[in-house]
Amino acid sequence: MAGGKAGKDSGKTKTKAVSRSQRAGLQFPVGRIHRHLKSRTTSHGRVGATAAVYSAAILEYLTAEVLELAGNASKDLKVKRITPRHLQLAIRGDEELDSLIKATIAGGGVIPHIHKSLIGKKGQQKTV
């Protein structure tokens, strides 16, 4: 066998590596999420392969939802940059996100709200 190339890879074309995020069509890193899931589990690192893909898809969807609502809030206020205030308005303005995200957002301010009993009717005026 002098001079010839022999081995497992002889004659095969090498394919480019495709990440699990690309296979799943996601932007969030499936491999990194899988690593974090394995490091935080109690069953000695046993996490299914699809668990990381599913978790990454959920995180990506929730992030896109919050960013879309925050972008709408910033457009309503005629600014081009999303601030913590816009995130706060977006999350507290949506009933489902409000029940899901209970965290306090630093720099988010408060949500304006006036109770209905405090609002006077149009025909009434206060007498002194």
Swiss-Prot record:
Variant histone H2A which replaces conventional H2A in a subset of nucleosomes. Nucleosomes wrap and compact DNA into chromatin, limiting DNA accessibility to the cellular machineries which require DNA as a template. Histones thereby play a central role in transcription regulation, DNA repair, DNA replication and chromosomal stability. DNA accessibility is regulated via a complex set of post-translational modifications of histones, also called histone code, and nucleosome remodeling. There is a cross-link at residue 122 (Glycyl lysine isopeptide (Lys-Gly) (interchain with G-Cter in ubiquitin)). InterPro entries: Histone-fold (IPR009072), Histone_H2A (IPR002119), Histone_H2A/H2B/H3 (IPR007125), Histone_H2A_C (IPR032454), Histone_H2A_CS (IPR032458). The modification N6-acetyllysine is found at residues 5, 8, 12. It comes from Gallus gallus (Chicken). Gene3D superfamilies: Histone, subunit A. It is found in: Nucleus; Chromosome. GO terms for molecular function: DNA binding; protein heterodimerization activity; structural constituent of chromatin. Keywords: Acetylation, Chromosome, DNA-binding, Isopeptide bond, Methylation, Nucleosome core, Nucleus, Ubl conjugation. Residues 89-100 are annotated as: M6 cassette. This is Histone H2A.Z.
